[in-house]
């Protein structure tokens, strides 16, 4: 057994152990007071790196959720604005429907047109002023916008909102068969009285659709009226609607004279004696209308005193009379009625409520005036056009001109908006087209909103899981750490006692000196 005074190994050992115990005790107290297992890199360097990455991811996910909520707010702002625009369009169509009946006077139609123009101003005002955080939403500039919805770059959702101003919506494409070819004027050889089958090309951008053939003749259930009926029966598939106007009009007012051997659509009317100029006493129109239930043709006089023969159901109109009788009718469509095969087919109008071209081919389609070489009347309008005049081009493409005489009457157009019957019909189509366009935009935005909501739900769950993972690494387990604290506290106290005893052991050396 050896005794040393200069170096107290036991005391040094007790001191070293005591320092470590105090360090552990301090660390345990720090963890208990902060609630964190990792307070500094030395506590768990690799764990801290992982926990910091998870904390960053959680914070970024939280911002992504806020971004998605901002995007939802923008989409909802635009959606509510367009909802108001659709209500305006519904009102415009209601007023157009109100104007589309000849019980209205020109003044009452002008009043309706004035209301519609005010409504269009408000529709454009909504399109130009709806904004979110200074960004215009409905002017067309909100295109291909991206929203970061993830913790890492390029995790985005894209959204675009087209323009909803009146000059960008409400497109209507109108095409009406030629009124200089066989589809309109009399055909002396009657080669246009035949079977016609139309083929609508690239209806949905890809497919062609062929409809059943229709006989063009003067019999009931035939003619472009029957053709129009078939087209409308499948309008949802073909993407177009059809209307027709079969009318023969004199080139000048009715002249005085006698009409001999008058036959219309195979029904013999006979001789009409002493017809007065302008058919002043109505004997010519009365004679024709007395058999209209058999001919399907109704006669009337226009404001200029010209006779109009109108096909009630869209069958062709065949008129025959003895030589020189055509002069009494005033020429025009009746210039050749002394021939044996004189017929008027009429004009077929196709309308599509968007801006795409209408492409037609088929069997004998030129016989109803739809060959491009025949000069098909075609025009595309948008909702803004309601503010102006529907000019002669619009009138012809919309089918307002049944023949050359009517085209001359409408050479300056058909007036503004709903101030005419045909104009009111066009405005109705425009309102439908505009509403469809807005509904498509709203549908797209609804899909974006649903995507954002789903994203928020997913990110929220992910954020919770990331937070849980971070907590598992960073946060302290109080039960475990309390046990550690008790251990370190006892060790610290016992260490102090041991150090005191180690120092006291050196006193034993004095006994050797006594």
From Swiss-Prot:
Keywords: Bacterial flagellum, Secreted, Virulence. GO terms for cellular component: bacterial-type flagellum; extracellular region. GO terms for molecular function: structural molecule activity. Gene3D superfamilies: 3.30.70.2120, f41 fragment of flagellin, N-terminal domain, Flagellar export chaperone, C-terminal domain. The keyword Secreted applies. It is found in: Secreted; Bacterial flagellum. Signal peptide: none annotated. It comes from the Bacteria. The keyword Nucleotide-binding does not apply. SUPFAM superfamilies: Phase 1 flagellin. Flagellin is the subunit protein which polymerizes to form the filaments of bacterial flagella. Important for motility and virulence. Heteromer of FlaA and FlaB. FlaB is located proximal to the hook while the remainder of the filament is composed of the predominant FlaA. Belongs to the bacterial flagellin family. This is Flagellin B. The gene is flaB.
């Amino acid at each position: 057994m050896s005794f040393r005074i200069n170096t107290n190994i036991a005391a040094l050992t007790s001191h070293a152990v005591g320092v470590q115990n105090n360090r552990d005790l301090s660390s345990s107290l720090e963890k208990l007071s902060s609630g964190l297992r990792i307070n500094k890199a030395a506590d768990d360097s690799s764990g801290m790196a992982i926990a910091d990455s998870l904390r960053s991811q959680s914070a970024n996910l939280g911002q992504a959720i806020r971004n998605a909520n901002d995007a939802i707010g923008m989409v909802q702002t635009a959606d509510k604005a367009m909802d108001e625009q659709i209500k305006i369009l519904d009102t415009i169509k209601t007023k157009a429907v109100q104007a589309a009946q000849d019980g209205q006077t020109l003044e009452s139609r002008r009043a309706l047109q004035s209301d519609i123009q005010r409504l269009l101003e408000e529709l454009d005002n909504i399109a130009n002023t709806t904004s979110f955080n200074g960004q215009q939403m409905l002017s067309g500039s909100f295109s291909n916008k991206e929203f970061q919805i993830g913790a890492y770059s390029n995790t985005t959702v894209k959204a675009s909102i087209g323009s909803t101003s009146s000059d960008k919506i409400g497109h209507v494409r109108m095409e009406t068969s030629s009124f200089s070819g066989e589809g309109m004027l009399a055909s002396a050889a009657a080669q246009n009285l035949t079977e016609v089958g139309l083929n609508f090309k690239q209806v949905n951008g890809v497919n062609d659709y062929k409809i059943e053939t229709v006989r063009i003749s003067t019999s009931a259930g035939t003619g472009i009226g029957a053709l129009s009926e078939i087209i409308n029966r499948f309008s949802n598939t073909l993407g177009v609607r059809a209307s027709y106007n079969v009318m023969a009009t004199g080139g000048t007012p009715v002249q005085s004279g006698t009409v001999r051997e008058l036959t219309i659509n195979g029904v013999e009317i006979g001789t009409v004696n002493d017809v007065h100029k302008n058919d002043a006493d109505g004997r010519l129109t009365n004679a024709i209308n007395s058999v209209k239930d058999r001919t399907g043709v109704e006669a009337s006089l226009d404001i200029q005193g010209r006779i109009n023969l109108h096909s009630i159901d869209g069958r062709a109109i065949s008129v025959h009379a003895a030589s020189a009788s055509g002069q009494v009718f005033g020429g025009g469509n009746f210039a050749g009625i002394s021939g044996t095969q004189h017929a008027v087919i009429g004009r077929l109008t196709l309308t599509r409520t968007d801006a795409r071209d209408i492409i037609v081919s088929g069997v004998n389609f030129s016989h109803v005036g739809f060959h491009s070489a025949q000069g098909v009347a075609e025009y595309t309008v948008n909702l803004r056009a309601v503010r102006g005049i529907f000019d002669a081009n619009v009138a012809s493409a919309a089918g307002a001109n049944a023949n050359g005489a009517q085209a001359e009457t409408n050479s300056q157009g058909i007036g503004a908006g709903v101030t005419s019957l045909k104009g009111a019909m066009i405005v109705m189509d425009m309102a439908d087209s505009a509403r469809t366009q807005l509904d498509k935009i709203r549908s797209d935005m609804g899909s974006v909103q649903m995507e954002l909501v789903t994203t928020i739900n997913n990110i929220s769950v992910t954020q919770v899981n990331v937070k849980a993972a971070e907590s598992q690494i960073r946060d302290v387990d109080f039960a475990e750490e309390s046990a550690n604290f008790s251990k370190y506290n006892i060790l610290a106290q016992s260490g102090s006692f041991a150090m005191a005893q180690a120092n006291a052991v050196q006193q034993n050396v004095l006994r050797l000196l006594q």
